[in-house]
Amino acid sequence: MPLLFILAELAMLFARLDSEGICLHITVPQKIEPRKGGDAEGKVTYVITIDGKPYSLHLRNHSFLSQNFLVYTYNETGSLYSDSSHFLAHCHYRGYVDEVPNSIVTLSICSGLRGFLQLENVSYGIEPLESSARFEHIVYQVKSDSSMLAGNDSHVWQIDQLDKGHFNEQDKNHSQLLPQSLKLHIIVGKFLFDYMGSDIMAITQKIFQIIGLVNAMLTQLKLSVVLASLELWSDKNHISTDGNATDILQRLLDWKRDYLTLQSNEITHLLIYRRRPKYIGAASPGEICSKSYVAGVGMYPEDIGLEGFSVVITQLIGLHIGLTYDDNIRNCSCPSAPCIMQQGALSSSGKKTFSNCSLHDYMHYVSNFDTQCLGDLSNVHVLQPNQAVCGNGIMEAGEECDCGNETECQFKECCDHETCRLKGSAQCGSGACCMPTCELSASGTPCRKAVDPECDFTEYCDGSSSHCVPDTFALNGHLCRLGSAYCYNGRCQALNDQCVSLFGKGSQGASYACFEKVNSPRENLANCDSKDSYSVPCGQQDVLCGKLACFRPPKNYKSPSQSVVYSYVHDSVCLSILPGLSMRSDGRDSAYVADGTVCGPQMYCINGTCKEVNFTGNDCNATKKCKGNGICNNFGNCQCFPDYRPPDCNLQIGSPGGSIDDGNTLRTESAFATKRLSKNEDSWVILGFFIFLPFIVTFLVGIMKRNERKIVPQGEHKI
């Protein structure tokens, strides 16, 4: 398979490449409400100030997340799991600066403004100032030096791979191009995952910013990138990333064929960190519709910024769609140099455009090669707010079933995984209460077992739905572990248990001095109040709610490969781990103390803050409402003990207990009436037997005595 390399040989690049954050400005963005009526939906305007000069940012919503977008990560056991609940599709906007012609703005506007302002020859980054109580933001100039790549013209491109035809003036007209789209599956290698901070949410947001910049550049070709999925190799590299870019690309193609199940029009890009690579990537040229060969490898050099790396991704995509590097032979030019397919674009700031050569290459490619896999943009389904997503395994409004994607679906005979509609006469097609025969499970069948013996409860099928009832568990703040810990979201959040799960048997929670060392506010360690992937230093009252600190176990750790941080306090060794490397079953970072952990008398941790335990908003009093025969659950109802029947926990011998929320309809009055009738019938039979038993015994004894009297001894007869 012919390969084309992205060859920016970076011999002089590393002296001064994309040094961000030199000149800082503080601004408070002012949101300008749109006029009512007209085409105001999806539009917003912000005014920011840079160097005392106001700039108006006119933005329009531009969602580039696929309708089925998921983020895949690996937990500490190496198991792959996915999540889509944290990502807001309506946050991404694109627009321009009113005062600057030919400018481009790409921003995420949820929880503050994050992104880039690309003017004619300068770029600015903007992000919220998290420590500010006001809506203050930092604006910084993205520095670059295009002379770093000057004279470095040693890139390789094989022009005979694709017949470009002859460049003539009529090919310059690209107005006939139709809007099209391509889907991208991005994989972030382990080393880049660590280099970007090892935080899943933060890395995901960075990838979003990169794709926003890529789409801004591809607008000139009327091409839009839709991010289909994101895979983070948070545990390890699943292929070797040693060697040159071509070797890695070949391994990626082999791994992709064996392990990835993608739609036919999805491109896979592996992004890896390489401190000083000779090449910044490798791609298969002109293979956009070849499922077996279309892939790319992008290398993230040391100190490069997100803006610079977005050029790498754009060049990779350019090679897929038939573009080649610009050169002097064809007199390539663009309004603002350097052009995107030139090496100097990697270290340039400001708006970037394709050259006349790139436009010709693309026009020629779409006219002469197979591009059916490039979807019509009008038919691309991007994720919208509160929109049902078919294939995510969650049955939402408008769906009859949702058994996951083609690989995950276990009910292929019952549910169409592409339309989320039932097949034929199927009663169900997904869910814990759906049988392989496409029939509903019987009422009272367990569908979700308790994961904690004290704080979580088993749920049952109700016989009318294919899905298990909502999870029921003890009311947050209920005491467990003999009063030494609290229940929180169905788990007994004992500190020692959290340490054991990380470091193995024998581990236990560390002393206050250890927590104070690990989360010292004096050292400005941002380990508390984690919200929207941003953290702040722990206050003195919150040190027990930051990073988890444990004492060293007597034997080897449960996970020897875990990145352990050692702290020494009063001759004791305190253990903690780096964030982003280990996830609990609920998807939360194991490096931090779990919500609900005791941090003082009648106090527990919530979002990195030590707060008072209270039951405000819940009127369930177990002593009164449950008569002391049960505890309150998360719905404010009684979870009754065995032999007590919900909802009020009245005495009912033989009742399994439970609540009215757990789905077990066998506890209804009619069910118990039937059960009582059956028991009564059995009781009368037993009672009658014991009443007549003495008469039966007397009768049998009388018969035995009468038979004894009838026996006469016989004498001996002599002859």
From Swiss-Prot:
One of its GO terms (molecular function) is integrin binding. Glycans are attached at residues 61, 75, 121, 152, 173, 244, 331, 356, 405, 607, 614, 621. It is found in: Membrane. Residues 20-179 form a propeptide. Residues 1-19 form the signal peptide. Its main location: membrane. The prodomain and the metalloprotease-like domain are cleaved during the epididymal maturation of the spermatozoa. Residues 387-476 form the Disintegrin domain. Residues 616-650 form the EGF-like domain. Expressed specifically in testis. Residues 705-719 are cytoplasmic. It is a single-pass type I membrane protein. Residues 180-378 form the Peptidase M12B domain. This is Disintegrin and metalloproteinase domain-containing protein 18.
